[in-house]
Amino acid sequence: MKIEEDRRSYRWQRVSAKGLLSSISLYLLLSSFISITFLSCTEKPKHFTHEVLNRMTPIKDQGDSETCWIYAMLAAIETEHLAWGDSVNLSPYYIEKMLEQEPQCPKSKRGEPTTTLRLLEKYGICGYDAMRNVKTPAPKWVFMLGATYTPQEFARSVCKPGEYIALMSDDDKPYYEESELEVPDNWLHDRYLNIPMDTLFAKTERAVLQHHGVCWEDKGHAMAIVGIAHDDEGEKYFIMKNSWGTDRPYGGLEYISFDQFKKTTIAVEMTKEAFWGRKGSPNPK
C-alpha cells in the first residue's frame, strides 16, 4: 500500500548518518502526506475523550513489511474474542509465512483483509507467542489452555468459515449485491456486499458500540476499529488500532473522523452477527 511504501523508504534512508538531514526532510514530508491522506495523525497531538474503547491485544509493529491487512484483520478477530471474555493473541507472522505458498501473491506481500480470512481458513493460525518472527518456522501444533490443535483446528476455533462479511460502498455498482472490490491488492478477487455509505457507516458505528471487532481500510492502509472518541470541539472519531508500534503520538492508536471515514473508506469487515445486529435478521438495511 502506498503509505507503507513511503514509510519503508523513510526507515531505509535514516540508517545513514550522512543522510540525516535528508531523512529529517523526508520524515516531515511523509508526516504531512500521511496526515493529509487519512487525517489520523494530526500535526500536533489533539486531546480526545474516549466514549467507547473496546478491549484489544497489545499494539504490534509490522516493521518494513506491507502487511497491514494481516495485522488489521487479526486485530479485529482478537477484539471480537476479547468481547466474549476469550483471550486470544494471534501471530501475523504465521499468515505472512503462508504467503510463500501462494503463487498469486505479489512480491510486495500486499493484500486485503479478506485475503487474511482466506489464508487463515486454508493454512490455519497460531498464537503470537509461538511465532514472533516471520523467519521462525511455522509450528505444526498449537498448544492452548491444555489442549493441542493443528493450526487449521485452532483457526476454526477463533474464526469459523463464513463468520465474517466484507462490505464496500461503490456508487457505480448495484447496492445490496456482491461485487468484486476492484483494487490491485484484491488478487484473490474476493467479492464484497455493496451498500450505501450511510448504511456502511451506521453498521460500523453500531458494531463498535456493541463491542464487536471491525476491520477498516482506505486506499493506503488498513487498521482495526476499537472505539469511538470526540475532540474538544465535539467532532467524533473512530479509534483505530494501528500496526506501526507504540512510539507514536497516541501510543499506537490513531483517530479517523466520522467525516473522513465516509470520504475515504473502501471496505470494512465484521462478523455477520455484528452486521445484522442480531442473529438471523432478514433486513440488511
Question: Which residue stretches match the model-derived regions?
Answer:
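Acidic, Ala/Val/Gly-enriched low-complexity intrinsically disordered segments
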Residues: E4-D6, V15-A17
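Cross-family signature of deubiquitinases and ubiquitin-like deconjugating cysteine proteases
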Residues: T42-E43, R55-A83, M98
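Papain-like cysteine protease catalytic cores
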Residues: V88-E153
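Bacterial Sec-dependent signal peptides at the C-terminal "C-region" and cleavage site
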Residues: F33-H47
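Active-site nucleophilic cysteine motif
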Residues: Q62-E78, C105-R118, H221
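Compositionally biased, intrinsically disordered low-complexity segments enriched in Pro/Arg/Gln/His
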Residues: L28-L29
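Active-site signature of cysteine proteases
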Residues: T57, G146-K285
